[in-house]
Amino acid sequence: MKFLGVKVYRFPLVKYYWPFFVGFGLTFYGVAKIQNAMMDTAEFINDPRHPRFKKGDLEKK
């Protein structure tokens, strides 16, 4: 059976690989939180590449 050109297999993918999907989600979330925390440290808060400059917040913090 094909759906939008993709072959459908009858293998229960989620049943066997759910720990990997959960691990990916937790890792992605953790890395994003660490990245945001590192961006707001004293060393990088006034870097012109900081996303707050794109928002128009030019005050030094």
UniProtKB/Swiss-Prot annotation:
This is ATP synthase subunit J, mitochondrial. It holds the Pfam family ATP-synt_J. The chain crosses the membrane at residues 13-32. F-type ATP synthases have 2 components, the catalytic core F(1) and the membrane-embedded component F(0), linked together by a central stalk and a peripheral stalk. The central stalk, also called rotor shaft, is often seen as part of F(1). The peripheral stalk is seen as part of F(0). F(0) contains the membrane channel next to the rotor. F-type ATP synthases form dimers but each monomer functions independently in ATP generation. Mitochondrial membrane ATP synthase (F(1)F(0) ATP synthase or Complex V) produces ATP from ADP in the presence of a proton gradient across the membrane which is generated by electron transport complexes of the respiratory chain. F-type ATP synthases consist of two structural domains, F(1) - containing the extramembraneous catalytic core, and F(0) - containing the membrane proton channel, linked together by a central stalk and a peripheral stalk. InterPro entries: ATP_synth_F0_jsu. It is found in: Mitochondrion inner membrane. Its main location: mitochondrion. It is a single-pass membrane protein. Keywords: ATP synthesis, CF(0), Hydrogen ion transport, Ion transport, Membrane, Mitochondrion, Mitochondrion inner membrane, Transmembrane, Transmembrane helix, Transport. GO terms for molecular function: proton-transporting ATP synthase activity, rotational mechanism. GO terms for cellular component: mitochondrial inner membrane; proton-transporting ATP synthase complex. Belongs to the ATPase j subunit family. It comes from the Eukaryota.
